[in-house]
């Protein structure tokens, strides 16, 4: 006869790897803290989850690498995000005189916006509601110092 030992179950907590990725790509001492460009776009007709899938790929990458990735992605969500990144880089070069080769995406986040409700007519005088979701996307570009 076998005996069983009761062990208390403790769930495993996943560690966040965002800072590790940043440390691998660019040392944090080379990121200039106050040299940032914020760009936000509100009410984009897209699901939060679809935008999040694209933003996870471009976070912690250089600008040129990001543009190349977004051009080659097959998702519909990549085009509005590409326009947003282009606009943020244009603002950085025009207003702050930053070089595009030194721009680095430190923050790319999406949040839920308003939901537009529509009704679709159905048989026997009924109607079904349709919820069109929208999202807000924020991109933060940071300038990286050249290593000496």
UniProtKB/Swiss-Prot annotation:
> Mind listing the GO biological process terms from this record?
translation
Q: Output the Gene3D superfamilies linked to this UniProt entry.
A: Ribosomal protein L22/L17
Instruction: State one molecular function term (GO).
Output: structural constituent of ribosome
RNA-binding listed as a keyword: yes
Keywords from the UniProt entry: Chloroplast, Plastid, Ribonucleoprotein, Ribosomal protein, RNA-binding, rRNA-binding
* Alphabetical list of PROSITE patterns matching this protein: RIBOSOMAL_L22
Question: CDD domains, per this entry?
Answer: Ribosomal_L22
Where is this chain's protein located in or outside the cell? Plastid, Chloroplast
**A single Gene Ontology CC term:** chloroplast
Q: Which InterPro entries match?
A: Ribosomal_uL22, Ribosomal_uL22_bac/chlpt-type, Ribosomal_uL22_bac/org-type, Ribosomal_uL22_CS, Ribosomal_uL22_sf
- HAMAP family in UniProt: Ribosomal_uL22_B (MF_01331_B)
Its biological purpose is as follows:
This protein binds specifically to 23S rRNA. The globular domain of the protein is located near the polypeptide exit tunnel on the outside of the subunit, while an extended beta-hairpin is found that lines the wall of the exit tunnel in the center of the 70S ribosome.
Concerning its family, UniProt says:
Belongs to the universal ribosomal protein uL22 family.
NCBIfam families, from UniProt?
rplV_bact
How does the record describe its quaternary structure?
Answer: Part of the 50S ribosomal subunit.
Protein name, per record: Large ribosomal subunit protein uL22c
Q: What organism does the record attribute this protein to?
A: Sorghum bicolor (Sorghum)
